[in-house]
Curated annotation (Swiss-Prot):
Protein name, entry field: tRNA dimethylallyltransferase
EC nos: 2.5.1.75
Source organism (scientific name): Streptococcus equi subsp. zooepidemicus (strain H70)
GO MF, one example: tRNA dimethylallyltransferase activity
Quaternary state and interactors: Monomer.
Length: 296
């Protein structure tokens, strides 16, 4: 059975994944699927670095603005949504291009993980109930002991990741469902960090503070509020930090997030990384995609 070919672009935040995805979509008749756990939420545009209206006009985007901020979203939800999007895109003769930085979501899709099938649901439920009795600290210690590093740490995601780790054989299909070309973008650490600092400054100038304040005042405890880009500004609203201090924390946490992203993809997935500073970029990637699409 022939597997559908898809392009997957990964890399740390602020490295230029969105721009490359749009360029490849234009060059190879593609449509973009967001692989970011936060971009599913409506009204959260700036802090999630969502493709702008102008960028979305250049290429069709899927899995953006599909949930209200009050709703939860998981790797399981993403896999179901992404599969439907891929099927839709392919049915119209176009190329699916996944762009994102949420490692667990992409791994779940590409390696065929699922919560169901042959897995004994009673066994899964028993393990889940056992995890629910643990404190947050105990959960995170268990994650660390198993070498699991999450893009964003919260209780729900910690439990889901431990389930995935515990039942890996039962949760993994016999065969990966797609034929992906993995494209990783990177650069020197100092360059990425400088790009992050500049992006945060631009976000603040574009209205991030107002977006974060709305989330803080309306929905401070929802899953969406725990994403990097929002919670770092909450201490400012609470009078516990100056705006300068909160902004500095946001930059620092985003830099740490970028480092974790790179570590995840290098350790968990077979990705060839290209430096965006190389003279061959992006032509070398265009050539690789062209060869990939011509392969039987």
């Amino acid at each position: 059975m022939t597997k559908e070919k898809i392009i997957v672009i990964v890399g740390p935040t602020a490295v230029g994944k969105t721009a490359l995805g749009i360029a490849l979509a234009g060059a190879f008749n593609g449509e973009i699927i967001s692989g970011d756990s936060q971009q599913v939420y409506r009204h959260l545009d700036i802090g999630t670095a969502k493709a702008s209206a102008r960028e979305q006009a250049l290429a069709v985007h899927h899995l953006i603005d599909i949930r209200e901020v009050t709703e939860s979203y998981s790797a399981f939800d993403f896999v179901q949504d992404a599969k439907r999007a891929i099927e839709d895109i392919v049915s119209r003769g176009k190329l699916p291009i996944i762009v994102g930085g949420t490692g667990l979501y992409l791994q779940s899709l590409l390696e065929g993980y699922h919560l169901g099938g042959d897995l004994d649901q009673k066994e899964l439920l028993a393990y889940r109930q056992q995890l629910e009795t643990l404190t947050d600290t105990e959960l995170y210690q268990l994650l660390a002991s198993k070498g699991i590093h999450l893009d964003q740490v919260n209780r729900r995601r910690a439990i889901r990741s431990l389930e995935l780790n515990q039942f890996a054989r039962d949760l993994k299909n016999q065969e990966a469902p797609y034929n992906p070309l993995m494209i990783g973008l990177t650069d020197e650490r100092e360059v990425i960090y400088e790009r992050i600092n500049k992006r945060v400054d631009l976000m603040m100038a574009s209205g991030l503070l107002e977006e974060a304040r709305w989330l803080f005042e309306q929905y401070p405890a929802v899953q969406a509020s725990r994403g990097i880009g929002y919670k770092e500004l909450f201490p400012y609203f609470q009078g516990q930090a100056s705006l300068e201090e909160a902004t500095a924390t946001l930059k620092q946490q985003t830099r740490r997030f970028a480092k974790r992203q790179l570590t995840w993809f290098r350790n968990r997935m077979a990705v060839r990384f290209d430096s965006i500073s190389e003279s061959s970029y992006p032509q070398a990637i265009y050539d690789r995609v062209e060869r990939f699409l011509k392969e039987p």
